[in-house]
Structure formats: C-alpha cells, structure tokens
C-alpha cells in the first residue's frame, strides 16, 4: 500500500522490529527503519525519507510506541543534503 501510494506511511511490528524491517526493505520503494525511541523516529523521516517505521513489541511498550509514532508522523523529509542519500538508495534498488 505504501509503494502504490494508497497510504503515505506504514507501521510494522515483530518481536524486535529487526526481522520485519529487513523484509520490508526488500520491497522496491520502501525505506523502513527500526526505531526504539522518538529521536531516531524523527531523524529517519527527516534525513532518510523513511516511509515505514518498525519497532519491536518485545522492546517498546505502548506509551513509548505512541511517542515514537508521534515523532515519525510529525516529521517531514528535509531534502537538501539528505536527498543525495535517498537518491543513492533508489539507485541501488533499481539495479
């Protein structure tokens, strides 16, 4: 749904968030990041233009999960110097 633009962002969970993020990043067009705290959630959107956030149900409690999601959904991609990195990721996907 994220790749087809039916939705803007996705949220994935597994035990640690690691396995599901690895699997999600195999899908062309997805930039998924595991975040266990709010600061990383904000920066992965601002600097990496992540469109999926993943976290671990065994790692993150419900209140912390809400804080993480608030930061992720409230952040905007900054572009600029970060656009080069995103372009490199997209180039690798297209190989």
Task: List the model feature ranges, each with a label.
Residues 38-95:
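C-terminal binding/interaction regions
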């Amino acid at each position: 749904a994220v790749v087809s633009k039916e939705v803007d962002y996705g949220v994935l969970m597994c035990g640690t968030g690691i396995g599901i993020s690895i699997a999600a990043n195999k899908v062309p067009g997805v930039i998924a990041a595991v975040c266990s705290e709010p600061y990383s959630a904000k920066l992965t959107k601002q600097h990496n233009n992540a469109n999926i956030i993943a976290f671990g149900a065994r790692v993150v409690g419900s209140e912390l999960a809400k804080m993480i999601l608030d930061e992720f959904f409230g952040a905007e991609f900054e572009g600029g110097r970060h656009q080069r990195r995103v372009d490199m990721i997209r180039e690798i996907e297209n190989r």
